[in-house]
Each structure stands twice: as C-alpha cells, then as structure tokens.
Amino acid sequence: GVVGLNTATEIKKLIRPNLDNSLNEAIKGFRPPGSMLNVCVYVENVGDYKEQVIFYESLKEFGNKSGVNISFASEAGEDLSKENIISFVNKINPSVFLTFENNQLSTVDYFQGKHSLSNIGKKLAEIIGQKLGKEPNGKSNMLLKNTKSVSIIINGNFYQIKLDSIFEVISGVYSDIY
C-alpha cells in the first residue's frame, strides 16, 4: 500500500490500541507497583539565599504531601552548567524532571521537536499551565531535549507560584496513566 504521513501513527494504534503515548513515552514512566513517583527539581539560582532555602523546603513539603519523592538537581546559592544538570538527571532517571526558571515568560514548556513530542509532558504542561494561568509551550531546548525523563520547565517568577497544585497535577496525571 501507500505509505503516508500518518502511517507510523496508524501502526502504533494497531499494536497498542487505546494508548495515546508512544512506547518510548511509556518506558519513561515505568516504575514498580506501589513505588512513589520520583520528581527531580532544578531551581535557577536567583534571589537571596534565605528565600531560596524557603522555596526548596516548600517544594519538599508539598511533594511529600502529594506522595511524590523529591530530589534536587540544584542547591541554594550554587550555579550549575546545563551539561551537569542533564548528566545528573539522566543518572537518577526520575519520572519527571521539573525546572523553575525566573524570567519574563509566562509559559510551561515541554519537549516538542520537529518530528516528535512528549505526550506526557504536553499533558502536564497543559494542566499545570491551566492551574497557574500560564500557556503550555512546545520547545526543543537543551534541558527538554537531552534528559531521558519527561521534562517540564515552568517560566516566570517562581517564588510566587502555588506549589501544592503542581505536585497534585503530576500525581494525578501519573495515576491516570497507571
């Protein structure tokens, strides 16, 4: 027959009916039954040290309340290269890699390349964006493209974000998948 633009998608649907995410996306989310969801967080080094420490403690607290195991790829008061962040995240391989970037944008970024995108990342970005009043945005930057985990970047003044809703969304999306 004729091979068209949607042939690969049609074949995936035949092989894995009722599943919207690719096999690669599904593999990223594998975890043993009953285990906690692991989220690795990177926080851009901005603001004074005390403000950063309070933000880190809040992340840990809200993550634990939502049943999420939090690890950090950053430390208060320290700058890291993107290569070191990517290497660390790929080594611990969390379910989700969450980045907070302080800038003027009001978006939640997920991976979207020329020929592929992260379906789970897009779903997370859409729901988190809705809760925080930010636009979901498909991008292909270094942190989104080179980490093996589902990656999300939350842009804006992150010290003013309601953190509890972020981890509730992540838990909810992953419980829907499993």
Task: Enumerate the predicted regions with their spans.
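Catalytic-site microenvironment of enzymes
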Residues: 1-178
